[in-house]
Curated annotation (Swiss-Prot):
It comes from Synechococcus sp. (strain ATCC 27144 / PCC 6301 / SAUG 1402/1) (Anacystis nidulans). It comes from the Bacteria. Belongs to the DNA glycosylase MPG family. One of its GO terms (biological process) is base-excision repair. InterPro entries: Formyl_transferase-like_C_sf (IPR011034), MPG (IPR003180), MPG_sf (IPR036995). Keywords: DNA damage, DNA repair, Hydrolase. This is Putative 3-methyladenine DNA glycosylase. SUPFAM superfamilies: FMT C-terminal domain-like. Its EC number is 3.2.2.-. One of its GO terms (molecular function) is alkylbase DNA N-glycosylase activity. The keyword DNA damage applies. HAMAP family: 3MGH (MF_00527).
């Protein structure tokens, strides 16, 4: 995708926000996966995490490398990395080019599919056959990956801390839709505080 086409994308304004804002705006949107054989799978984004420059948990915290280059955008570029030598995670670059800023898609809810299929970044990438080959690709109507707008009310939004980190552990930069069965890990205390219910 050319820079001009990227700037004309309907997703450019949403993803040009700081990651902490884009992570909220992406909830309820649909991540679209197109396959070469014509198949299309859509998953509703129900959980996200934000990573920004200056955040010690951000992959680009120290510097840009060949491995994390896609995280530096421009907004709308796809950043895929591998963890534990077997699982992949998909992120969408945000805010501005040459800035380490991205949103991790942490859970997707797939229609007519068991919730476990999208409950976690590794699971959803396996279900959608997302791996490092898609790193550096772009969201778009002719690309393997795209976004579609949210088409029904989000429900209750929960804000809490991120998962599986050793740095930046206190930053409340994870958001999820409380009513979704596909959320990877619930924070019952945060739900009690933000929904006004007992634990």
């Amino acid at each position: 995708m050319t820079t001009a086409a990227l700037l004309e994308s309907p997703w450019h304004p949403l993803l040009s926000q700081p990651a902490t804002e884009a992570a909220i705006a992406l909830l309820g949107c649909w991540l679209v996966r197109r396959f070469a054989d014509g198949r299309v799978i859509r998953g509703r984004i129900v959980e996200t995490e934000a990573y920004e420059a200056g955040d010690p948990a951000c992959h680009g915290y120290r510097r840009q490398t060949a491995r994390n280059r896609s995280m530096f955008g421009p907004p709308g570029q796809v950043y895929v990395y591998q963890i534990y030598g077997r699982y992949h995670c998909i992120n969408l670059a945000t805010e501005a080019a040459d800035l380490a800023s991205a949103v991790l898609i942490r859970a997707l809810e797939f229609p007519d599919t068991e919730a476990i299929a999208g409950a976690g970044p590794g699971r959803l990438c396996r279900f959608l056959a997302i791996d490092r080959q898609l790193d550096g690709s772009w969201l778009g109507p002719t690309s393997p990956l795209d976004l579609e707008a949210a088409d029904y009310p989000l429900g209750t939004l929960i804000q809490t801390t991120r998962i599986g980190l050793t740095r930046g552990v206190d930053l409340p930069w994870r958001w999820y839709l409380a009513e979704s069965p596909a959320v990877s890990r619930r924070d019952r205390r945060a739900e009690a505080e933000q929904m006004g219910v007992s634990v």
